[in-house]
Amino acid sequence: MREAIKCISEYVQCPISMAAQCVIGAISHIAQRNVNAPHPYVKDGEPCSLFLLSEGQSGSRKSSAKTIADHSIKEYERLQYDRYRRNDRQWQKKFLGNEKKEHKSCLAETKEPKDPSSVFSDITIESLLGLYIDGFVTNVSISSDEAAQFFAGHTMKSETRNQALATFTKLFDDGYVERTRSKSNLNGSGRAYDVRLTFNLQGQREVLIKALQDPVLRGQGFLARFILTVPENLAGQRFQDKEHQSKDINTDSRMIIYWERCSDLLNDSSDHQRYVIPLDEEAKKVDLAFYNEIESLQAKGKCYEYLQAFASRASQLARRLATVFTYFQGEAFINKQILLAACDVIRFSLNEWLRYTEIELDKESDAEKLIKNLKLKNGSKK
């Protein structure tokens, strides 16, 4: 996985952190189907699904990096959808070929095929709830290199935004959704347990900065669940030579190994319930130390004093990320090295969030200065 990240960054000429987010988003989508992260108090663990957010200007190569990281998932989705279309055509032919009175028995004998699509770039909360509750999907990714589709979309602009945010946080925490409707409503009531959602969003600062400083999105804890990266813009430094142009990422062993591993995990047809990947004894020590480290930095006067909603989730996010890494590597336990790497990613993310908090505080300070100046001017005129 580490080599695949380096490979993407090298060929695409994008920052390592951007390539890493793309790969993490892909393997979170794959891992959430089969494993749970360890939880301090819950025997069955918690979802290992991750919420990821990357800022990148137009031309930062974020789309190219994401396309490469998602290659195996897209191929898998395409093959599954082609199979569904074939089965659906056969089913429709059989169903419509029967007399109307035989439709009920036909439905009992052969169920209508379900669209297996599980990766969406743009989907409303109502549509998503419907897919979960009706049993069409259990594992979904909202994945887009145009974050505006989500943050400026219907769900985040509608009157029910707060309800949608509560649903997303419940999905993240418990893998559970519910919908309560009147009997006359076509979109009926229902619940879905053990469902999963990964967010992998990328966008430009002009789009993201409004969302990331939105007091509702921050206050409800929605954004606090995201791992954020705001990489340096490499424009003006991405020079190429003949050697670079002659290389082919499709024949690079680093990518082939990564893509094959993704495909193997996606095609794993083992019929089993999700299982928890536990921490080994050394990893437990790392988990404890990391928790106490971040807790101490939330004290008054410390760097995360005004970032407590985000910092308080650091240990949880590190365990989830380590679970995803461990599953991808085929290990039975989360070891010390894997958890240390996950902790480094979460520290990096917290510092990225801190930068946005500082931008907001600077704006408030400027506003306060303006008010003071106006008051002074008005006072001098009297």
Language model features by range: what are they?
Residues 1-382:
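Phosphate-handling catalytic cores of nucleic-acid transaction enzymes
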